């Protein structure tokens, strides 16, 4: 049975990757269908009730700069906002918001249901229709076939998902949802390497049974940050506090006593879990010398009593979970509302993807999110946007696009995955980006919004706001460079008391702002120097561009140098054994990863700059050095 309409792009799955993929394709004008097993769970936050953080917040800002929904939904759902690393340099500052699950889901669903060119249909997908290594459609659980030349799979943890609580396990996509068994089996027939990964979630606690007076209160920032470049504090709902408590030796003894019934430590779970979000069992085992571990007590929303205890993800049996929770200060009488669990699921080796996130094996088939071995809402959303966008470009007969590593964290993410692959759930950190001084949260729109507009991702409202901001930054920088203070100027009366060293020669306003003791707000508050910019985002940009100009230029020079060979192609039939001077280790790694370009080769672990130089000399001698058009 065939559906009565054809589509340009079909997106399978309605989580963070799927929603961004469907919205991106639809914004670009493609007739798009979003298939989900349950419309009510579109935009569901399956694990922690938070968006953003170190590295992750950078991705959210990039999604936003390209017209995505995640930041906007967070502004409408965020019940606590904080800027992390606020005392450090701008490259590593990151916005994090505690989110009300229900409000977030409602906002995402509202955006989806009001997006032109987008249809939503509730049915699980069981099969792909492939002809001559090209996807042409999908078949749902009830045998209904939908046709489209581009399919984006965003299956999350549903592919052959298996939930573990103690020694008990059962099939599931997440708690309360069925797994995608038939689709997983179909995908295993394709010529794409497959593996198993694992993630987990903590038990949820009834807030009425917690003694918050025994814990440390953690309030949000004042003034409140916003997540979206076009967001406003007035969109935020009521703000609440989080709390901090700790495990103790009694907690650790309870956990150790239950390890014989842990699916992780008894060999029941095969999948590898996230290194940077370990279960409490892993923490006790890996950091045996630590007497306590921090736990963040996070509200799940304004209309629920459920609490998310961030830091005690576990798959231990329920009785052990209850005992370990009640051993923690402030939770002596706590009641568990939902047990913690681990979930194993299929993922596919992202080295079998192009950087457009299209599979190399099947034309028109795109993967995004946890199916590619990543973990996290933000990583999923960023991939979803890229996959949906490239699916739309393919249907339009246009060239695929992916930002470079020096252009976006999204570029770092995709390049890491498609070049290096992953054996454990991959999450983003600022440390993964070698050019992080240029890839800041604050300038994501300046880096990407113009490209987003060119691609058709950015609407008029966002574009007009961006143009106004960009012009105000440029005009203010011109003003600061063109206005000067002289040693005999009347302005020195208000200026010199604010300086560590008084003015002895003429200086531009830009020179004054560059001084370590001066900031933009202080300079603009002095009589004769203002009034300055009212837009705080633009003012921040002016200050950063002035104060860090030397470092920014140095990093740009490094990028220009690397880019000269970044896109130099490596011939598909290149025999690395024939390249004189390469070590056996380097040859093995190059043969294993099969990089497409010199840039990709340079980022393979163990490939030294010397090896890249040898490779370039060999290619040049053979007349094989050519670049991507």
From Swiss-Prot:
GO cellular component, one term: cytosol
Chief localisation class: cytoplasm
Example GO biological process: tRNA methylation
Cell compartments where the protein resides: Cytoplasm
Cofactor needs: FAD
Residues that hold FAD according to the record: 13-18
GO MF term list: flavin adenine dinucleotide binding
Keyword Flavoprotein part of the UniProt annotation: yes
Subunit structure: Homodimer. Heterotetramer of two MnmE and two MnmG subunits.
Protein name, per record: tRNA uridine 5-carboxymethylaminomethyl modification enzyme MnmG
């Amino acid at each position: 049975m065939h559906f009565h309409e054809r589509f340009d792009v079909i997106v399978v799955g309605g989580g963070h990757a799927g929603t961004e993929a469907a919205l991106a394709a639809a914004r670009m004008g493609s007739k798009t269908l979003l298939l989900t097993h349950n419309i009510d769970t579109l935009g569901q936050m399956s694990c922690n009730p938070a968006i953003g953080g170190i590295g992750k917040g950078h991705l959210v800002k990039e999604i936003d700069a390209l017209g995505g929904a995640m930041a906007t939904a967070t502004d409408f759902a965020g019940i606590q906002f904080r800027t992390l690393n606020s005392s450090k340099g701008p490259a590593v500052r990151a916005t994090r918001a505690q989110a009300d699950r229900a409000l977030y889901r409602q906002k995402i669903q509202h955006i989806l249901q009001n997006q032109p060119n987008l249809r939503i249909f509730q049915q699980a997908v069981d099969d792909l229709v492939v002809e001559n290594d090209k996807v042409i459609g999908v078949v749902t659980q009830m045998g209904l076939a939908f046709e489209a030349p581009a399919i984006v799979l965003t299956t999350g943890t549903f592919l052959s998902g298996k939930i573990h609580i103690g020694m008990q396990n059962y099939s599931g996509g997440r708690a309360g949802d069925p797994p995608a068994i038939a689709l997983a089996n179909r995908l295993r027939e394709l010529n794409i390497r497959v593996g198993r990964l694992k993630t987990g979630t903590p038990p949820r606690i009834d807030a009425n049974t917690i003694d918050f007076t025994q814990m440390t209160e953690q309030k949000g920032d004042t003034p409140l940050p916003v997540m979206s470049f076009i967001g406003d504090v007035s969109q935020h709902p009521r703000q609440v506090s989080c709390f901090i408590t700790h495990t103790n030796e009694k907690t650790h003894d309870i956990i150790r006593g239950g390890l014989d019934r842990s699916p992780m430590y008894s060999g029941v779970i095969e999948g590898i879990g996230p290194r940077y979000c370990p279960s409490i069992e892993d923490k006790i085992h890996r950091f045996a010398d630590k007497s306590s571990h921090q736990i963040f007590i996070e509200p799940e929303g304004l209309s629920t009593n459920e609490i998310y205890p961030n830091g005690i993800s576990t798959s231990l049996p329920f009785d052990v979970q209850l005992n370990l929770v009640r051993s923690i200060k402030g939770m002596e009488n706590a009641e568990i509302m939902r047990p913690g669990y681990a979930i194993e699921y299929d993922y596919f080796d992202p080295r079998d993807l192009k950087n457009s996130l299209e599979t190399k094996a099947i034309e028109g088939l795109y993967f995004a999110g946890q199916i590619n071995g990543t973990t996290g809402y933000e990583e999923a959303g960023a991939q979803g946007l890229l996959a949906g966008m490239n699916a739309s470009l393919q249907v339009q007969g246009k060239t695929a696009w992916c930002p470079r590593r020096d252009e976006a964290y999204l570029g770092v993410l995709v390049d890491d995955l498609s070049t290096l692959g992953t054996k454990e759930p991959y999450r983003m950190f600022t440390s993964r980006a070698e050019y992080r001084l240029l890839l800041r949260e604050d300038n994501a729109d300046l880096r990407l919004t113009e490209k987003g507009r060119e691609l058709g991702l950015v609407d008029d409202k966002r574009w007009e706001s961006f143009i106004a901001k960009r012009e105000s930054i440029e005009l203010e920088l011109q003003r600061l460079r063109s206005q000067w203070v002289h040693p005999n100027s009347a302005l020195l009366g208000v200026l010199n008391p604010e300086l560590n060293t008084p003015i002895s020669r003429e200086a531009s306003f830009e020179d004054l702002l560059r001084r370590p003791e001066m900031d933009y707000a202080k300079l603009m508050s002095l009589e004769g120097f203002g009034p300055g910019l009212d837009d705080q985002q633009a003012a921040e940009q002016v200050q950063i561009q002035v104060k860090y100009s030397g470092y920014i230029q140095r990093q740009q020079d490094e990028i220009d140098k690397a880019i000269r060979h970044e896109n130099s192609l490596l011939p598909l039939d290149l025999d690395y054994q024939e390249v004189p001077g390469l070590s056996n280790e380097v040859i093995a790694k190059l043969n294993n990863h099969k990089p497409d370009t010199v840039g990709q080769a340079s980022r393979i672990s163990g490939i030294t700059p010397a090896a890249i130089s040898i490779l370039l000399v060999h290619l040049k001698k053979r007349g094989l050095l050519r670049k991507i058009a």
